[in-house]
């Protein structure tokens, strides 16, 4: 019973209307139950829709404290709006479904993710199953004892390893960033630094391994695009013409990051 999860027995009895004069209270308890069931059905529908559109996340490693999950492109790492279904909700559902956590456990601990990826970026996200796992993994990312690398395919030929610098300003209304070579707008711009390593290349395309020295919103996508090497399939910062060519020829509809 959903209500019992949140109240002690004596409080629940009062709430549910165990006393003789319980008609009003009992009706309210029934309304709460109906409301909780309605919310649950809504969440399930949203989850099914996300899985249908993006694919289901895949747990690729698990021990007693952490999960490593392959997040599909199109899925949020964390919810942006109340009704979103993100990777955070998936982690809770996964641990409930596998019996690692119970609904009672979730009253005192909410599993979370230790790193985030943009919605349209696929890749590995670490999650904590326990407080210790969450703290240790988060600290490893923060202190850079654990390194993150991104793989992407960009337009044009890059044959030398390089580190590029610049400044980034985000427009929250359009959810888009602009890159500058020098600081702009009275100090509003944030410094960015991106390292890339060519893995292989042709005259028209390059497979890059990217290391974010700073971690700003949309940094890889916007920084590479500002240098004339936009990520293939990136509808926000890439070339519409080139994206259309790859979509028609190779059926690529997601960004190659």
Predicted features along the sequence, with ranges:
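RNA pseudouridine synthases
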Residues: 1-257
């Amino acid at each position: 019973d959903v209500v019992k999860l949140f109240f002690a027995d004596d409080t629940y009895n009062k709430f549910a209307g165990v006393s003789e004069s319980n008609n009003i209270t009992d009706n309210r308890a029934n309304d709460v139950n109906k409301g909780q069931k309605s919310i649950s059905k809504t969440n399930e529908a949203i989850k099914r829709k996300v899985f249908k559109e993006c694919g289901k996340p895949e747990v690729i490693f698990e021990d007693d404290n952490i999960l490593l999950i392959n997040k599909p492109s199109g899925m949020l790492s964390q919810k942006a709006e109340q009704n979103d279904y993100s990777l955070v909700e998936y982690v809770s559902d996964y641990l409930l479904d596998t019996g690692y956590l119970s609904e009672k456990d979730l009253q005192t601990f909410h599993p979370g993710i230790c790193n985030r990826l943009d919605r349209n970026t696929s890749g590995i996200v670490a999650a904590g199953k326990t407080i210790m796992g969450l703290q240790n993994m988060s600290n490893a990312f923060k202190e850079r004892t654990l390194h993150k690398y991104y793989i992407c395919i960009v337009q044009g030929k890059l044959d030398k390893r390089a580190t590029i610098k610049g400044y980034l300003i985000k427009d929250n209304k359009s959810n888009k960033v602009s890159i500058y070579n020098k600081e702009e707008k009275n100090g509003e711009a944030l410094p960015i630094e991106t390292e890339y390593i060519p893995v292989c290349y042709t005259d028209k395309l390059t497979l890059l391994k990217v290391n974010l020295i700073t971690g700003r919103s949309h940094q890889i996508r916007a920084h590479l695009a500002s240098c004339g090497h936009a990520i293939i399939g990136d509808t926000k910062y890439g070339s519409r013409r080139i994206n259309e060519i790859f979509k028609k020829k190779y059926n690529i509809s997601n960004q190659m990051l």
